[in-house]
């Protein structure tokens, strides 16, 4: 074997970048649809592309997202929930154009939102009304700060979406009750970050998808709330740091009720 002497740091190493990232894939957002489990999987061997994967009860996994798509949203720049699924129908944000696409089971994705500078995320599907409630971020006016709103998006005919909640700087986490009659969401304003202070709002969902009786039910400038979720019986649960620790709470007629008082953080 011939030995070659080269300056320090200039030799050809057997440890390549491809070798380092080959097994560094990661799993993200997880959703349930009946007995099926869906999740986002980052594929380093495919240029760090994100795809939706489905696992059925028999243990079989299937890549749902076609090759030319990358499931990722740029809402809030940090990103967020980038897909939703109901009855086998997957709605997702594509990273390249930030449009929302609908993909029926076994079918190809078709765009629902127009080719304008709008971003969507945190979607939840309402099959009874054929809507998806989600965050929309409007970047269509150059030089203006992006406008965040909660919108309903027609999952059959598409469009830009109908604005349901607006006026604050940021919105996130729309959550639809199991019976489809109520919607909860989070909102906050500059200069706060969501880990500083957020407001939890709820509203009744009318038959046409519009909202009524919207009201703030918890939170504030010094109370960071996240992960609002409805139980099957219509109770709203959420995490709040009003004690200095992110603990679990339940919304009652008398306001938030502390479920577990611990010097510990709770989150999914």
Question: What residue spans do the PLM features occupy?
Answer:
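Short loop/turn segments that connect beta-strands within beta-propeller blades
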Residues: 56-59, 104-107, 154-158, 205-209, ...
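Residue-level detector of Asp-centered blade-edge/turn motifs that repeat once per structural unit
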Residues: 32-34, 85-87, 126-128, 178-179, ...
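A flexible loop/linker signature enriched in serine peptidases of the S9 family
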Residues: 41-51, 71-77, 92-100, 114-120, ...
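Beta-strand-rich domains and repeat architectures in extracellular enzymes and scaffolds
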Residues: 5-55, 70-84
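Predominantly a core beta-strand signature of beta-propeller blades
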Residues: 5-8, 17, 60-63, 99, ...
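Generic structural signal for coil-to-beta-strand starts
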Residues: 36, 89-90, 130-131, 181, ...
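Repeat-blade elements of multi-bladed beta-propeller folds
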Residues: 80-88, 130-136
């Amino acid at each position: 074997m011939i030995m070659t002497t080269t300056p320090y740091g200039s030799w050809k190493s057997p440890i390549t970048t491809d070798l380092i990232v080959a097994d560094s894939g990661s799993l993200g957002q997880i959703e349930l649809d009946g007995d099926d489990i869906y999740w986002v999987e980052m594929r380093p061997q495919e240029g760090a592309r994100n795809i939706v994967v489905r696992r059925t009860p028999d243990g079989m996994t299937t890549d749902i997202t076609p090759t030319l798509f990358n499931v990722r949203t740029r809402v809030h720049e940090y990103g967020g929930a980038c897909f939703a699924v109901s009855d086998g129908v997957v709605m997702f944000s594509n990273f390249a154009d930030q449009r929302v696409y609908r993909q029926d089971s076994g079918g190809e994705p078709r765009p629902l939102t127009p080719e304008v500078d709008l971003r969507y995320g945190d979607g939840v599907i309402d099959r009874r009304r054929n809507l998806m409630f989600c965050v929309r971020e409007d970047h269509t006016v150059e030089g203006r700060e992006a406008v965040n709103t909660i919108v309903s998006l027609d999952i059959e005919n598409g469009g830009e979406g109908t604005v349901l909640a607006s006026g604050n700087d940021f919105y996130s986490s729309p959550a639809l009750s199991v019976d489809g009659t109520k919607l909860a969401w989070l909102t906050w304003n500059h200069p706060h970050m969501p880990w500083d202070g957020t407001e939890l709002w709820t509203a009744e969902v009318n038959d046409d998808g519009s909202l009524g009786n919207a009201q703030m039910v918890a939170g504030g400038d010094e109370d960071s709330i996240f992960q609002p979720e409805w139980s099957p019986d219509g109770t709203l649960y959420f995490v709040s740091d009003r004690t200095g620790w992110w603990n679990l709470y339940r919304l009652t007629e008398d306001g938030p009720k502390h479920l577990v008082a611990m010097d510990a953080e709770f989150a999914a």
